[in-house]
């Protein structure tokens, strides 16, 4: 990309540099959920309708919020970990903000915590750790389903995903 901008679009490169500088200067983290925002609280956290559901969805990264929002299936609030537990990499509970999550659970009332970490070993370990914390607050804890993607074929799915699909099966309603 750098070569292209230098050879063919220097003004575009300058505009990109200016936009990146603006973003780095003016965008920070939401005080409530930790996603990126230009204000102290993001638009989701400021929305009073989001509090009605009593649900808190915990995700690994800010872009996970966008993916969930595009489905239109969730109308609660979020908490962004900014990663997952990875002790070998020196990433423990404090590095992903679990102390801040506990503060939030103490200050706010939730009916359900939805764990939407990635379906990886680290994501599962993080979800299990968070579930233990949440049970201290007597709140319902659920995990998003994992399984076969729409349009996927069984022969192309790995054994772990297929096992999760069988374990998470549900009644077929007509």
From Swiss-Prot:
Classification via CDD domains: TOPRIM_recR
Pfam hit, one: RecR_HhH
Tagged with keyword DNA damage: yes
Keywords for this protein: DNA damage, DNA recombination, DNA repair, Metal-binding, Zinc, Zinc-finger
Xref: InterPro entries: DNA_Rcmb_RecR, Rcmb_RecR, Rcmb_RecR_Znf, TOPRIM_dom, TOPRIM_RecR
Classification via PANTHER family: RECOMBINATION PROTEIN RECR (PTHR30446:SF0)
Name of this protein: Recombination protein RecR
Gene: recR
């Amino acid at each position: 990309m750098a070569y292209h901008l230098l050879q063919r679009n220097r003004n575009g490169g300058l505009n990109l540099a200016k936009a990146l500088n603006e973003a780095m200067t003016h965008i920070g983290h939401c005080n409530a959920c930790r996603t990126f925002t230009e204000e102290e609280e993001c638009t989701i956290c400021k929305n009073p309708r989001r509090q009605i559901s009593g649900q808190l969805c915990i995700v690994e990264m800010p872009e996970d919020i966008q993916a969930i929002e595009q489905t239109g299936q969730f109308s609660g609030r979020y908490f962004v970990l900014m990663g997952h537990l990875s002790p070998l990499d020196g990433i423990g509970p404090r590095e992903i903000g679990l102390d801040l999550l506990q503060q939030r659970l103490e200050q706010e009332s939730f009916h359900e915590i939805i764990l939407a970490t990635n379906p990886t070993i680290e994501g599962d370990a993080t979800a299990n750790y968070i579930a233990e914390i949440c049970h201290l607050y007597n709140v319902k804890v659920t995990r998003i389903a994992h399984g076969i993607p729409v349009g996927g074929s069984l022969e192309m799915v790995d054994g772990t995903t297929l096992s999760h699909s069988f374990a998470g099966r549900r009644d077929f309603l007509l």
